[in-house]
Amino acid sequence: MNKNTIIGFILMAAVLFGYSWYVQPSEEEIAAQRKQDSIENALRQKAEIAQKNELKAKKEQAAAAAKGDTTALFYQALNGKNEQLTLKNSKLQLTVSTHGGYVSGAKIMGFKDIKGDNNLTLFSGNEQKLNFMLAGKQDNIVTADLFFTPSNHTDSTLTLTAEAANGGQLVLNYRLGKNYLVNLQVQAKGLNGFFAPNYRQVDIEWEGLCRQQEKGFTFENRYATLTYKEKNDDSDYINETEKVTDEPMEFAIDWLAFKDQFFSSVLIPKGDIAPNSQLSSIPQEKGSGYLKQYIAKFKTDFDPTGAVPTEMEMYFGPNDFQVLKAVDEECSFDKDLDMQQLVYLGWPIVRLINRWFTIYVFDWLTQWGFNMGIVLILITMLLKAITYPLVKKSYMSSAKMRVLKPKLDEATKQYNKPEDAMMKQQAMMQLYSQYGVSPLGGCLPMLIQMPIWVAMFNFVPNAIQLRGESFLWISDLSTYDPIIEWGTNIWLIGDHLSLTCILFCVANILYSIMSMRQQKDQMVGQQAEQMKMMQWMMYLMPVMFFFMFNDYAAGLNFYYFVSLFFSAAIMWVLRKTTNDEKLLAILEARYKENKANPKKMSGLAARLAAMQKEAEELKKQREARH
């Protein structure tokens, strides 16, 4: 990278920051925009409320008409008492409403909520609904309108029955397992004549509000998605925007998930979710207590004879990799669910690192009962031990170039003009070749470490084991740790300062200074001048990291801080244990050996030599013309 390129990067960064600052609205403009936004939000909410009231009125009118229609098939089930019945085990407590027959509440045991309660409420009241709509020849059955009669009610089982006038029944059977799965069977009995002969699919509407469960609204919102798994493919999610997202799915789907950062509601039909399902994600206002509203409209298999019930499993639980992996074994359906994909582990190569290394090491350390902060430190130490040979190789390559610097200065002092840059480079490469030193020897090992850095970037924010865990001054490793907070949002910063983010950025600056000093000792001529420009970019990166990571999990910032500390310690130890005189003696011996038995130039050196020869020929031709 030459001087002009570095200056170009710095200027581009300056232009971007300058433009961002310039276009930033003034306080008056912000106030005016807030007022305008408030007006628009009020109008939008008013329109939404009016639309909802209109739909509600139509439904109530239709329900009232149905209740008054004594000839309706399920006339008797249109009136009744709404009871909230409980299913529970040691990990999950569900509430089932007899009006509509759906799971109206889910409480996950052993996980604290944002208010500090020991059991987390995933949803309650009208926050989530599941509605089955069965189309008949002359009439429709809508489970949301029906009152079901409960029977066979235990902690793990519940049968809900809606009686038809002709003696037929619509039966919902719930069966709660030992963990987070509940099985639901929907069966029509004695209703065969009600449906058309070719009726084979039931329409389902699943709607839910995603609660804000964590402290940071913006950070948690990034991981709240309506996720689905395409049949015979990987999972995906509908694109998130600030506006309503409504996407038709033109393919069959294995399961749907209303996903939050650490918890999910998942619906898994035994049959496929038919193509052309409609999925919607509606962002909610900050401060409302909700992140998004999810709506899924789809079809799945239905047997009107009642011989085979429409069956599905519902998962209400944590986004824990091992727990989700076990769902494949617990689920009785013949499907490859891969629900562990709800825990995002990064791009393919990064996912492999997290899938086959990070998770197992993390779980192994966790089972010993260590504090999660200690676990992060131990993982850092293990990763540093694994990558130590690469780091040492990189350092030794730099050390060799450092001890050869006087010889490089001597060999290249005659090439001071800009037009001599190619000759200077050739002289340096020739000297490196004679001493058996590769100038690129320190680059590849460092590049190999990058996937590990990115892997932890994806793993830590999704590790539910860090949720609610404290360490030192950090009250919760899964969210930011504010050293100071204020009520208003400041551009690029937010409404707080994270202490671990500050420590990470300060450590980054100190480590950059340490690295730059070491690299300066091995630079020659123009390279040394370029290094002066490069150091400003190195100082700029921590500033950019501050704006990026101020809202991130304290556990991630703490990991990067500890990682930089160990990197600096390793570099210091290597510097203290490297004897420059002995290293130079080894290189001199290699120089004599190579001089006595010259080796063929490497590919890079050969190409540079060819380029040098071509440059010299062109120079001679230009001089001959003049």
Question: Which residues does each predicted region cover?
Answer:
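Soluble non-transmembrane domains of integral membrane proteins
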Residues: 77-338
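Short, Gly/Pro- and small/polar-rich lid/capping loops
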Residues: 48-82
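Helix-loop-helix
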Residues: 1-56, 96, 186-189, 205-220, ...
